[in-house]
């Protein structure tokens, strides 16, 4: 019964920790992920939680049992013979000093083991995600060596913990045996002197074993405690991490917006970086307008659009929708009116319908199909073995890059956003498909009066934009329509000639 209840309790601890960790990870800001390795996070949710679970089960019960036995045996020894008890207990402080030094040394070692395991998981995760790139460049041997190097580090750290055990516990046993030797010597002299019987000495020595056993048990458990403590510290680093972007206590729901977007002296730098990515950016986009963002590499294009749904918070100035500062409204009400199609398309394991309806799980099949038609995805989806019920693999394996992007566009359109953000969202489709998608997007923008921000790589995307912003080193170097910038902006013409692709046929 004790074993069952202990295991049930430990599984409950692990269950609650996993839920709490995942819930926190879902809400941490993007700045946190910019500083953390995926492998380290996976290790904390798996291996570190398991170390805590193991100690929370058998370890806690054994520790409590050892403490009770130690206390009870001490009282019994003092009751039987005060002098012999004092001789026996004289070694106890020395044992606890040795154990304390052991715990202080082993704790950082266990933390290093978990960190090395996290690095190993990071390499594994990177290689599994990039297996095609590895094969394409024939880097299998290099990646094998890289994995072996991290694995060697993990092995070395584990062996160091083993050596720490080997270098400390023999001394603990030695001191414990000194206590037994003292009892036999001092008690034997008293037997010879006639003040103690042989039976009493044997009984006392037997009880002494009940004193040393819990001490040694506590010693062994101290290693498990140190390991669980190191894992707990890593787990609570996540649980105690501040959420950089969250609702204010007095945040209000954002009402349905016409979506007038205003950047007012916006400044931004990434957490831990002193370099400003955006430096006092100010502009205004009226409802229903399309704003194209262009700029040199590292000029802050993606950063600018990431501030609209509050993936990050500005470090100066303000971003407003219809006059509402995005920091003063709830995240759910803000993001429910924003549709985003990123350059790197992510699909989840599940059906095509589930992926398109990810933002609106209650959407009907007719609504899903309408969004797919608008994104020019309906035709190829209907050709799949089970149509919209076809299951796609992890990250959309089985679909081409262009097909994945069209599903992502359909997913964004289905939520009927008032603000649509396209981060080079047609980069993986051919020219004919890009022209068809662009035509549909243009029609949807005009008919629904959506405000659109687009980071583009093709001339056709920016030619018809109502406002083009040219960024350079975090500042707006030029703004205006295509015709105005062709006449007035040297930087725009350089980008036009060097970075943008020609307009597709029919675009």
What are these regions (language model features)?
Residues 1-15, 23, 27, 34, ...:
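Transmembrane-helix motif of ABC transporter permease domains
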Residues 58-112, 185-196:
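Transmembrane helices of ABC transporter permease
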Residues 247, 254-507:
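ABC-type nucleotide-binding domain
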Residues 30-31, 47-56, 60, 64, ...:
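An intracellular "coupling" helix at the cytosolic face of ABC transporter transmembrane type-1 domains
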Residues 92-100, 165-179, 198-223:
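Hydrophobic alpha-helical segments in the permease module
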Residues 21, 25, 134, 235, ...:
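Helix-loop junctions and hydrophobic alpha-helical segments within the transmembrane domains
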Residues 11, 31, 39, 43, ...:
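Short active-site loops of ABC-family nucleotide-binding domains
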């Amino acid at each position: 019964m004790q074993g069952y209840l202990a295991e049930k309790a430990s599984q409950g601890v692990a269950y609650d920790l996993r839920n709490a960790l995942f819930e926190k990870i879902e809400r941490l800001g993007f700045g946190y992920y910019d500083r953390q390795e995926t492998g380290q996070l996976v290790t904390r949710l798996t291996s570190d939680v398991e170390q805590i679970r193991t100690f929370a089960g058998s370890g806690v019960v054994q520790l409590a049992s050892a403490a009770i036995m130690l206390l009870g045996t001490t009282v019994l020894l003092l009751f039987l013979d005060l002098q012999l008890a004092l001789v026996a207990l004289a070694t106890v402080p020395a044992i606890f000093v040795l154990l304390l030094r052991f715990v202080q040394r082993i704790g950082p070692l266990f933390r290093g083991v978990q960190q090395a395991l996290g690095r190993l998981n990071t390499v594994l995760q990177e290689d599994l995600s990039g297996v095609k790139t590895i094969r394409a460049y024939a880097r299998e041997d290099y990646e094998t060596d890289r994995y072996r190097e991290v694995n060697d580090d993990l092995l070395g750290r584990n062996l160091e913990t083993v050596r720490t055990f080997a270098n400390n516990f023999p001394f603990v046993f030695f001191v414990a045996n000194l206590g037994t030797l003292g009892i036999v010597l001092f008690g034997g002299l008293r037997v010879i002197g006639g003040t103690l019987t042989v039976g009493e000495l044997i009984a006392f020595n037997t009880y002494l074993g009940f004193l040393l056993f819990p001490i040694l048990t506590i010693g062994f458990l101290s290693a498990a405690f140190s390991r669980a403590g190191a894992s707990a510290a890593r787990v609570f680093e996540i649980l105690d991490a501040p959420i950089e972007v969250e609702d204010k206590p007095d945040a209000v729901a954002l009402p349905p917006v016409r979506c007038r977007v205003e950047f007012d002296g916006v400044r931004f730098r990434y957490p831990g970086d002193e370099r400003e990515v955006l430096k006092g950016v100010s502009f205004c986009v009226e409802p229903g307008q399309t704003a194209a963002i262009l700029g040199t590499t590292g000029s802050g294009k993606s950063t600018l659009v990431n501030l609209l749904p509050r993936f990050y918070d500005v470090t100066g100035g303000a971003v407003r929708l219809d006059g509402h500062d995005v920091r003063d409204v709830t995240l759910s009400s803000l993001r429910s009116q924003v549709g985003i199609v990123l350059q790197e398309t992510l699909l989840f394991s599940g059906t095509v319908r589930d992926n398109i309806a990810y933002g609106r799980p209650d959407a009907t099949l007719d609504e899903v199909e309408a969004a797919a038609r608008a994104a020019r995805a309906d035709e190829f989806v209907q050709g799949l073995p089970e149509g919209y019920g076809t299951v796609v693999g992890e990250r959309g394996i089985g679909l081409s890059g262009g097909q994945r992007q069209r599903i992502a566009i359909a997913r964004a359109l289905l939520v009927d956003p008032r603000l649509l953000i396209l981060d080079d969202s047609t980069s993986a489709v051919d020219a004919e498909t890009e022209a068809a998608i662009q035509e549909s997007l243009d029609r949807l923008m005009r008919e629904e009066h959506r405000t659109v921000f687009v980071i583009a790589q093709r001339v056709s995307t920016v030619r018809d934009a109502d406002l083009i912003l040219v960024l350079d080193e975090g500042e707006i170097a030029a703004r205006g329509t295509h015709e105005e910038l062709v006449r007035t902006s040297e930087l725009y013409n350089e980008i036009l000639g060097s970075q943008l692709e020609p307009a597709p046929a029919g675009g």
